[in-house]
Structure formats: C-alpha cells, structure tokens
C-alpha cells in the first residue's frame, strides 16, 4: 500500500515558490487536458472584436492567476490534510484554465496582464489568512470566489462575437469546472458567506477586471 508523503514546512514553501513561478512565467505551466479550442474552427474577426476578446481573455487569465494563488495560500495553512489535498487538487485543475486562456491570448496577438504578480501576491495572502482562520472559512471563500468567477464568465460569454467559437469553447468549459468547484467547497463544509461579504468581494473583483482589460 502506498504511503502518503509528509512535507516539512520548508518543503511546502519551496513547492509554493515553484507553483508561483509556473503560474507567473509565460508558457511555463502545462495543462492536464487539451484546450477545448483546438477542435473549433478559426474564423476571422474584426480588429475591434479581436482586441475586445483579448481583453476579456486577459481578465479571465488574471482570474485564474488569482485562483492559483488563493488555493496555494489556503493549502499552505489548511489545518486538515483532506482540505489541504482538496485545495492542491483544485489548483491543479485551475492550471488547465490558466494555460487555455494564455494560449488564446497569444493566438489573438495580445499579452497577459503585467499586474499578475501583484494580484498573485494579494490572493495568496488572502488564501493563507482564510486558512489560518478555519478550514470552513477557507472552503467558504473558495465557494464565494468561484461564484464571482462564474458571473464574470457568464457575462463574457454574452459579449463574445458569434464567430469566436474558440474562446466560447474555453469559457464554457471553465464555467462548468468553476461551478463544480463552488459546489464541492460547500459540500465539504464550507461556510456560506453573507451578502455584505460577497458584495465586498465583487467590488475587489471589479478593480481587477477594470485594470487588467488593457494592461
């Protein structure tokens, strides 16, 4: 029977540093699943639509950077091993989204946000603090965050040009995955955040979306 490996605090810090580099350095992360966009035809879009879609995908990419940092921060401070493993597994799934968005951004001739390191650091800190408070709060924060992500994805799907099947396929799969993450976090005992807290989170999310649309 295989035994579970136990990491020292130093081991975990080194793993966090490795995760941060794979998240922030271009083309350094590798997905477990191929992008849903690969089976979609590549239709020509106007320059205006191309720039708009690139901006939307840049927002989504930064959202995945934040998700990576949030999960890694929570995994570092989670009290129960099963919660830590759940956070680490969720972070692995989010890598797919991260890479899919990055690939699509480059296909559109654009770039990822220069603000990603800042948002990674902020999200990592928030995740670590949530994990210190309690695992229930940590899981609840995941559910509330994923709810915000789902709202953004739904809004972006409505804004996509009809001919952009590639971006649509990516966002639809991301939406499905994020809904599952939110449900799993609550089923695992996550605390349901009250409306005022969710409102505050939505304000922070708007700061991120407004700032990363162009830069």
Curated annotation (Swiss-Prot):
Molecular function terms, GO-annotated: 3-demethoxyubiquinol 3-hydroxylase activity; metal ion binding
UniProt subcellular location: Cell membrane
Keyword Manganese in annotation: no
Pathway per the UniProt entry: Cofactor biosynthesis; ubiquinone biosynthesis
Residues that bind Fe cation 1: 64, 94, 97, 178
EC number: 1.14.99.60
Name listed for the protein in its UniProt record: 3-demethoxyubiquinol 3-hydroxylase
GO cellular component terms, A-Z: plasma membrane
Reported function: Catalyzes the hydroxylation of 2-nonaprenyl-3-methyl-6-methoxy-1,4-benzoquinol during ubiquinone biosynthesis.
Keywords attached to this entry: Cell membrane, Iron, Membrane, Metal-binding, Monooxygenase, Oxidoreductase, Ubiquinone biosynthesis
UniProt cofactor note: Binds 2 iron ions per subunit.
Similarity section: Belongs to the COQ7 family.
Biological process (GO), any one: ubiquinone biosynthetic process
Cofactors named for this entry: Fe cation
UniProt keyword Oxidoreductase present: yes
Positions contributing to Fe cation 2 binding: 94, 146, 178, 181
Catalyzed reactions: a 5-methoxy-2-methyl-3-(all-trans-polyprenyl)benzene-1,4-diol + AH2 + O2 = a 3-demethylubiquinol + A + H2O
């Amino acid at each position: 029977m295989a035994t579970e490996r136990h990491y020292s605090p130093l081991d975990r810090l080194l793993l966090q540093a490795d995760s941060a580099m794979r998240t922030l350095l271009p083309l350094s992360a590798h997905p477990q699943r191929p992008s849903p966009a690969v089976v979609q035809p590549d239709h020509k879009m106007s320059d205006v639509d191309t720039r708009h879609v690139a901006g939307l995908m840049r927002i989504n990419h930064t959202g995945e950077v934040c998700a990576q940092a949030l999960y890694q921060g929570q995994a570092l401070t989670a009290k129960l091993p099963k919660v830590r493993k759940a956070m680490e597994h969720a972070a692995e799934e989010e890598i797919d989204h991260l890479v899919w968005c990055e690939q699509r951004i480059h296909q559109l001739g654009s770039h990822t946000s220069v603000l990603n390191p800042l948002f990674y650091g902020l999200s990592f800190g928030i995740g670590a603090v949530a994990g210190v408070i309690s695992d229930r709060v940590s899981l609840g924060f995941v559910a509330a965050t994923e709810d915000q992500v789902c709202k953004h994805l739904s809004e972006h799907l409505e804004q996509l040009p009809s001919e952009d099947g590639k971006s649509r396929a990516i966002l639809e799969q991301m939406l499905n995955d994020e809904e599952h993450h939110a449900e799993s976090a609550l089923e695992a005992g996550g605390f349901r955040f009250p409306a005022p807290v969710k409102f505050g989170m939505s304000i922070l999310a708007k700061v991120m979306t407004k700032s990363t649309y162009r830069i």
